[in-house]
Amino acid sequence: MNRILRLYAFLLPLLAAVFVFEFGVNVPYWDEFEFAGMMSGGPGFWKYITAPHNEHVMPLGKLAYYALARLTSMDSKAMMYLSVIILSIPYLLLVRRIRTHDLMAAAATVLIFFTAFFSPRSCVNLLWGFQPPYLAAFSFGILAILSCDWFLRTRNGWHLLAASLCCTAASLCSAHGLLSWVSVALAAIYSRQFRKCLASLAPAAIIAACYLVSARHFPPAAGGGGVSPAGS
């Protein structure tokens, strides 16, 4: 049974890759047309990077998408495969982490959840080429959870600091800024637990302040639609 579950766990991301191979096409979607304007890296490049995209503040995600677009020559299907890889890494880490402690827990939680997550209906979302920044945010969130788990088991302060950095990175990839507040809390615990100077709070506090300023000056459009100021 152990081998069957392990084989099943590793087959799920492979099936997602087969789905992309079968149904993916190199055709940009709506947001990708807007992002294509910055691919040249022209004079308004950095202004576009720092401007909100709808309700998202995602400079790290935009930079990642820019790099991927240049690397793949704006090949949407190549980015679909990359989306599968980005999803598979934290998934396999979760399977390995839980399996080492309780096989039934892995079967009842991770495998059941990802069976739905990698199902053909969910894999339709992978056919949107502009997924890597959002999936990177998801992956950083999973890594933050794993880092907190490692901290609880080992009491190693570096794991808690890694969780804080993962939360900040997730917020900068595509989140609405909520995870930046988690990173502040984790940094505060790190500072208190290990008697570090309060300077360890500075990066997370700056990120949170940037989100507050951005939310004040660039509120999301009604219904979450519209385009970013730089793209209008």
What are the functions of these language-model segments?
Residues A107-F140:
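Aromatic- and kink-enriched transmembrane "portal" helix at the membrane-lumen/periplasm boundary
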Residues W150-T168, R195-S200:
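Short hydrophobic alpha-helices at membrane interfaces in multi-pass membrane enzymes
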Residues Y65-A69, M79-L93, P133-F140:
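Transmembrane alpha-helices of multi-pass, membrane-embedded glycan-processing enzymes
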Residues H159-C173, L178-A188:
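Membrane-interface alpha helices of multi-pass inner-membrane proteins
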